[in-house]
């Protein structure tokens, strides 16, 4: 029982997205020999291997047959819709659902790079609360997502109701000032 719990905890640590610069995507150098853990005939070794993924070009994505393509698309859809950040779940999940079937291998690599970004940072960059780094802003998937988000934002929210560029959207409540320095319009 203790061995089983230890293996489950090791699996959770390896799969954790809290580890900076880590991903659960199998790296291109998959010909290395990794320890293989068998449980009821299921190979958990290289499948859950994590490695530093500073560049999206490190991924070995196999879209050669329909089964591999289906699995890859399903994983990407799941990762984009189940981030735990409601706004990103909706925006990113819908965009991926609309566009993932038409992506080639480079598009999938760019999408994986975007999916590996932290939620708060990605949201601030998509909504122009902060400037994204050059590596992110040059990503074609990020650019398309950013364009969609800004188009929807401009369509549904008047500019005077938004925070100034580079500023957080929500101003914290201050019991002493009681909102005297609040924006002229909007509920920020």
Swiss-Prot record:
Q: Where in the cell is it found?
A: Mitochondrion
Q: Which regions form coiled coils?
A: none
Q: Name one GO cellular component term.
A: mitochondrion
Highest taxon, organism lineage:
Eukaryota
Question: Transit peptide range?
Answer: 1-21
Which UniProt keywords are listed? Chaperone, Mitochondrion, Transit peptide
User: Which InterPro entries does the protein's record reference?
Assistant: SDH, SDH_sf
Respond yes or no to whether keyword Metal-binding is given for this record: no
- How does inactivating the gene affect the organism? Inhibition of primary root elongation and early lateral root emergence.
One Pfam family, short name: Sdh5
The UniProt function text for this chain reads: Plays an essential role in the assembly of succinate dehydrogenase (SDH), an enzyme complex (also referred to as respiratory complex II) that is a component of both the tricarboxylic acid (TCA) cycle and the mitochondrial electron transport chain, and which couples the oxidation of succinate to fumarate with the reduction of ubiquinone (coenzyme Q) to ubiquinol. Required for flavinylation (covalent attachment of FAD) of the flavoprotein subunit of the SDH catalytic dimer.
Similarity comment:
Belongs to the SDHAF2 family.
Protein name (Swiss-Prot/TrEMBL): Succinate dehydrogenase assembly factor 2, mitochondrial
Supply the source organism for this entry: Arabidopsis thaliana
